[in-house]
């Protein structure tokens, strides 16, 4: 049984006329114990798969500075380890209030028996600040990839059966298609789609309904020159356009073989990877909010030869996004 506060997720219902808030409050009853859980993500977060170290000061994380800029969450890749990466604890320790989320832990390698206790440990040290993102990964990356939906159901069952379960409100699914989106609404706080156009955000909201969290990742290029911006975007997109889960999802929105080949057509790149000056990129992020996203995970794609974290771009974008 799950009940939700205003704008909450799970089986609860938002209070009529209540203002929408950018957090989720869920209470799970499991084995006669109650787990009050919430994660405040804010409207915009940072998604990053590389080093969180400052280019200017290589021994210093940028997490505290991102928190001071107003970003509500820091999303980091979960990798393919059996447990949770130590990066999550390090980011939490370096900050005071910002949420930290995995985007994502692979259900094929992140064993529930390892992940669950690690989440509980983070909760004991940093109450209410860690969100577990779980995903099905991709057939080319997993040696024994079969029946991903059924495997995800079994994975969630295993998390629920732990001595210290991972509550529904503390987990999100990397959902793209309708079945996984429905599962995200029924068994998690919501969905964390990756590499999607704004049309997917609108459709995901219609599948999830008004309550569950919708937090898409959106990669951006802060570059006004079309040729240079699209070249950077294609370099980023090339890997994802070789993975069937992403290409099948893009086909749902009218993109064909000619769009997917060669690192992506201009039409596809422009739809999936917003580019332009800071104001233009900020407007494209707001389109996802207007389409139903509660929270957007912003991933800056920077040019070749750039070492360290692209803090300058995130600083500029924060000025535009936090202002409105």
Language-model segments: which ranges?
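Compositionally biased, low-complexity flexible segments
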Residues: 1-19
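Compositionally biased, low-complexity segments enriched in small residues
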Residues: 16, 24-25
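Active-site-adjacent structural elements that line small-molecule/cofactor binding pockets in enzymes
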Residues: 8, 21, 27-324
